[in-house]
Design a protein with these regions (language model features):
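Solvent-exposed loop segments of extracellular immunoglobulin-like
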Residues: 59-68, 154-155
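Proline/serine/threonine-rich low-complexity linkers at boundaries of modular beta-sandwich domains
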Residues: 19-33, 119-123
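Short loop/turn motifs at secondary-structure boundaries
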Residues: 40-42, 47-57, 119-227
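Solvent-exposed segments in extracellular or luminal domains encompassing
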Residues: 79-99, 177-179
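Bacterial Sec-dependent N-terminal signal peptides
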Residues: 1-25
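Beta-strand-rich extracellular modules
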Residues: 103-107, 197-199
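Conserved Ig-like domain signature around the intradomain disulfide
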Residues: 96-104, 190
Length: 227
């Protein structure tokens, strides 16, 4: 009786405990300087978009899993890229949808197991430039820049010329602009010329040429006249 009890006790204390590894694949990215994260999809994002994918494993115990992040474009059966890290970063610069699937292999004798898929959708491009601005210090429309509805512009270069064809300013940041000055001094009110060369994530090339009117005496409705 004692021997049987000893054997049962020994078995209870020597049987291995099953630990189930868990993963929580998550995409981390930034929109307008705000940190964002998603476990299922990123919808209608603007390019270029840098996303860090993390497997976020837990309860691994003695398990040392191998990771595969498979990047597949919508409509394709095969991934265009595979990454083999627990955490990987990718910059999306093309319009369309991409599925990012995390597969995990626990040992050399098992097939990769699909954990989950995160879908990233990049919008088509859009770029428009206004034909006037009023750099009068009222805090409204003081900077000449691309309209706020721009989307997925991955290359951008804008040039400002005066009436004699002389370049007086240029910028390459889609969120930048011109304050109506040249060499630190305000330019005269009147008509100037903008040339914009840009490229969208969908491959569309922009070659925008138009007049730009400086309206220094114009006060936007609702703006304060105080300095």
């Amino acid at each position: 009786m004692r021997i049987r009890a000893f054997i049962i006790t020994l078995l209870l204390f020597t049987l291995p405990t099953m630990v189930l590894a868990e993963f929580n694949p998550t995409a981390y990215y930034t929109v307008d300087d705000q940190a964002m994260e998603s476990t299922d999809f990123i919808n209608d994002a603007q390019a270029p978009l840098t996303v860090t994918f993390k497997a976020n494993p837990s309860n691994l115990g003695n398990t040392n899993p191998a990771y595969e992040w498979r990047f597949t474009k919508e409509g394709s059966q095969e991934p265009f890229m595979v990454r083999y890290e627990e955490e990987t970063t990718f910059e999306f610069v093309e319009s369309g949808s991409t599925s990012v699937a995390l597969y995990v292999t626990y040992d050399s004798n098992t097939e990769p197991e699909l954990i989950s898929t995160i879908k990233v959708s990049i919008s088509i491009s859009l770029l428009e430039m206004p034909n006037a601005f009023s750099p009068n210090g009222d805090g409204v429309n003081d900077i000449y820049k691309a309209k706020d509805n721009h989307k997925s512009i991955i290359e951008f270069h804008a040039y400002i010329f005066n009436r004699w064809g002389q370049k007086i300013y240029d910028w390459t940041d889609i969120n930048g602009g011109w304050d109506g000055t040249h060499n630190g001094k305000q330019v005269a009110a009147g008509v100037y010329y903008v040339l914009v060369k840009a490229k969208g994530s969908d491959g569309r090339k922009y070659n925008i040429r138009r007049d730009v009117n400086i309206l220094r005496d114009y006060i936007e409705e609702g703006a304060s006249n105080n300095p």
